Amino acid sequence: LGDVYKRQPKREFRATWLASVSNIDWPKSTQTSEEQKAALIKIFDGMQAARMNAVWLQVRPMSDALYNSAYEPWSKFLTGTRGVDPGYDPLAFAIEEAHKRGMELHAWINPYRYESEKNMNGADDSIRKNHPEWLLEYSSSFILDPGNPEVIEYLVKVIKDIVTKYNVDGIVFDDYFYPYEGTKNEDAYSQSLYKPEGKNVGDWRRENCNKLIADIYAMIQETKPTVKFGIGPFGIWGGSSSVAASYGIEYLNTSGGTSAYSQLYCDGVAWLKAKTIDYISPQCYWPSFNTHVWGYKTLVPWWAKVAKTMDRHFYSSMRISTMPQNSPQRMKSVLRRLGMSENEYNGLSMVERSIAATAAKGTEECGFEVDMNRSTDLMGAPGHVFFNTTQFFSYGLDTYVAENKFTEPALTPVMSWKTPCDLPDITDISVSGNMLSWSADADETIRYAVYFVPSRVANNPQTYETSAYLKRITWEKSIDVSSYTQSGYVYAITAIDSYGNESQPYIKTPSGVQSGIVDGLVVYGGSGAIYVSVPKDMDIYIYSFTGQLIRMVRVSGGNSEITVPAGMYIVNGTKVAVQ
């Protein structure tokens, strides 16, 4: 991959899957509520230190809830017993703590799973007792029947409850649709009721899933359109060449691997084409050295092209446990990474050697995958989603990415197909002691980026095109700036909407707040032109409202006229309307 991304992008998606099912990551059911809160804060502190900007928290692992649901019982993974109130609202707490640390929180939903082991939810569970016809029985589990229209209506209500009551930044589904073990005739009853005569059963099952996705997306747009909707399906799409051609995409022959399309009846390309998701995060869980056609080197470029064709974002999901142990031939590299001599290494037990080598090779594979995600991105929206959060820390990837790949904060990518929200003016910027604070007339979806910028370049829009001076992202209107007190620098604050659109910078100078305006610059819009008055020769930067540089014009001191089409612009940080 060479030097493709020596300087990291200002915008990319950085997240982990935070699993609650079976208490994989969080919470631990043996902990008290206060201990669970403290554990989550520790996780989020670690993610912030690694400069992550999102977390996917599993809040509905098994037709249950890690939030105050109007429809489903409290999850057993909170207290050890299904239906027992944990004494606090985990989702509300998690949103507040994530936003304090500049991270989006997407509520991770498993839509269909009811029980991973038969009868674990009990005979008196509401769904089993009141709607047994909603359940499909498999060899060792039950799922909600994707082919039952009442199930679709119910799931839309469940998710609307979350979207309505909580300030989540997104809803994300995982890879569980029809089960991996395959579906033979378990849904025969639903077929007899709902499958059109002559309809291919595979097409019918895929349409059931497609309808749920479409209905969820429509509900979100109607209820709270600032909430993003994405899915993390199995990484191998698996459709045929004829289906690929009908979608207008390149066919990737992955025969021999599990097919999401024909085994899980999960068609991620269909959702992208229908524009019923905002992002897709296929679980590309095969490492770079995998020689099969579905290895990381093959899947990631293919998904990037598909996402580009459909004008949606692709954030690759990466499995940490497949970042394996090192080989003897690479031991020198291992020792270098561990900072050990060969004698020190030889003094370790076999278990310690295994752990050490796994961590060293894991960082190498992690670095390769991050670089590949960036180099193959075609939307200006690279993304990295690590599974799982516990291993993100235990493998030392948090330290590795902070020191090598995520050395600066990053904003989440702009979703250009969304209508930008109105961004507030930022006023009353002040510093009191160690606290920088400001005011803004904005709702709870708006977040803020804080830059610490050399005063000599603070008024140049190009200064804000990279993350070089980006220090914090927060939903709050104050931060501790005790680490940013160097003389000759100023604070600049921008407002950012849910889709990633960023305002002009508002700069705190010794004389007050200025809206990215150079002293002495006067700029205003007229009929078909932008008019500027400057005290000396100056570069004028004209940007679209979505942040695209349209023109750079060098003007002489005095008055100048710059002809442009009608529209809204940002000129050296000032909003300008041209008729």
Regions found by a protein language model. Name each.
Residues 447-486:
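Recognizes extended acidic, P/S/T-rich segments that occur
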Residues 19, 23-37, 107, 112-161, ...:
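Active-site-adjacent "subsite" loops/lids of carbohydrate-active enzymes
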Residues 265-269, 273-292, 306-418:
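Substrate-binding cleft of secreted/luminal carbohydrate-active enzymes
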Residues 451-457, 485, 512-579:
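C-terminal outer-membrane/trafficking sorting elements
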Residues 52-53, 60, 101, 124, ...:
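Polysaccharide-binding and catalytic clefts of secreted carbohydrate-active enzymes
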Residues 433-444:
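Conserved aromatic anchor
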Residues 481-502:
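Beta-strand-rich modules
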Residues 2-5:
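Short, small-residue-biased leader/transition segments that mark boundaries at the very start
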